C-alpha cells in the first residue's frame, strides 16, 4: 500500500508541473502594463505568488488524498468511482469522529451532570439552611421584642401602682402629722386654758380672802376651815 502511494506521489508531482506549464504562456500573452510604483508591483507579485503556491499545495494534498491507495482500494471494493469512494471515506471518517465524540460525551457527561446536580442540590440545601436559620433568628428577635413590650408594660403598671400607693401613703402621713399637730396644739391650748383658769381662781381666791380679812375678823380656826374648803374646791375644778 505504501509503495503504491510512493509511486503515485511522483506521478501527482509530475502532473502538477504539467498543469503549471501553460501559465507562463498566459502571462506572456498579457499586455505589458506601465508600472508607476516598483515596490507595489513587486509586493503584488509576491502576494499572488504566495496565494498561488498555497493553492497549489492544498490542491496537491487534496489530489494525493483523493488518489491514495486506500481510496482506490475502497472504490474497487465498492465498485464506484474514485471521487465517490473519496467522499464515502470522508463521510466514514466524520462518522467515526462523531461516534467517538458521542461515546466520550455519553461516558463523561453523566458524571459531569451528576456532580453539577449534586453541587446545585448542596447549594440549595445550604441556602435553605441559611434561610431557616435567618427565620429562626427573626422569630427569636420578634419573641424577645414582644416579651420586652410585655415587660415594659408590667414595669409601667407596677410603677404606676407604687406611685399611687406612695401618694396615698404621703397623703395619709401628712394628714396624720396635721392631726397630731392639731391635737398637740389643742392639748397645749387646753392646758394653758386650765392653767389660766387656775391662776384666775387662785387670784380671785386670794383677793376674796384678802377682802374678807379686811371686812371680817375671823378666828384662826375659821380661817383654816375656809382655806381647806377653798383648796378642796380648787382641786375639783383643776381635774
Swiss-Prot record:
Keywords: ATP synthesis, Cell inner membrane, Cell membrane, CF(0), Hydrogen ion transport, Ion transport, Membrane, Transmembrane, Transmembrane helix, Transport. The keyword Cell inner membrane applies. Pfam families: ATP-synt_B (PF00430). The keyword Transcription does not apply. One of its GO terms (cellular component) is proton-transporting ATP synthase complex. It is a single-pass membrane protein. Residues 1-64 are annotated as: Disordered. Residues 23-33, 45-64 have a biased composition (Basic and acidic residues). It is found in: Cell inner membrane. The chain crosses the membrane at residues 85-105. F(1)F(0) ATP synthase produces ATP from ADP in the presence of a proton or sodium gradient. F-type ATPases consist of two structural domains, F(1) containing the extramembraneous catalytic core and F(0) containing the membrane proton channel, linked together by a central stalk and a peripheral stalk. During catalysis, ATP synthesis in the catalytic domain of F(1) is coupled via a rotary mechanism of the central stalk subunits to proton translocation. PANTHER family: ATP SYNTHASE SUBUNIT B, ATP SYNTHASE SUBUNIT B', CHLOROPLASTIC. Belongs to the ATPase B chain family. This is ATP synthase subunit b. It comes from Koribacter versatilis (strain Ellin345). The gene is atpF.
Amino acid at each position: 500500500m505504501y509503495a503504491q502511494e510512493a509511486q503515485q506521489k511522483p506521478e501527482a508531482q509530475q502532473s502538477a508541473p504539467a498543469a503549471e506549464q501553460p501559465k507562463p504562456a498566459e502571462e506572456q500573452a498579457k499586455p505589458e502594463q506601465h508600472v508607476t510604483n516598483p515596490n507595489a508591483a513587486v509586493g503584488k507579485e509576491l502576494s499572488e505568488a504566495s496565494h498561488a503556491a498555497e493553492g497549489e499545495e492544498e490542491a496537491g494534498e487534496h489530489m494525493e488524498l483523493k488518489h491514495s491507495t486506500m481510496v482506490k482500494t475502497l472504490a474497487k471494493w465498492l465498485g464506484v468511482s474514485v471521487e465517490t469512494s473519496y467522499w464515502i471515506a470522508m463521510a466514514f471518517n466524520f462518522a467515526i469522529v462523531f461516534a467517538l465524540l458521542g461515546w466520550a460525551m455519553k461516558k463523561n457527561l453523566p458524571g459531569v451532570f451528576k456532580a453539577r446536580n449534586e453541587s446545585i442540590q448542596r447549594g440549595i440545601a445550604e441556602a435553605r439552611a441559611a434561610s431557616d436559620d435567618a427565620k429562626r433568628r427573626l422569630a427569636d428577635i420578634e419573641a424577645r421584642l414582644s416579651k420586652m413590650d410585655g415587660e415594659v408594660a408590667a414595669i409601667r403598671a407596677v410603677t404606676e401602682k407604687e406611685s399611687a400607693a406612695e401618694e396615698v401613703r404621703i397623703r395619709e402621713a401628712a394628714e396624720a402629722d396635721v392631726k397630731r399637730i392639731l391635737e398637740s396644739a389643742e392639748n397645749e391650748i387646753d392646758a394653758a386654758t386650765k392653767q389660766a383658769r387656775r391662776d384666775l381662781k387662785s387670784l380671785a381666791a386670794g383677793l376674796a380672802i384678802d377682802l374678807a380679812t379686811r371686812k371680817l375678823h375671823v378666828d384662826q380656826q375659821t380661817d383654816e376651815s375656809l382655806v381647806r374648803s377653798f383648796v378642796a374646791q380648787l382641786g375639783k375644778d383643776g381635774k
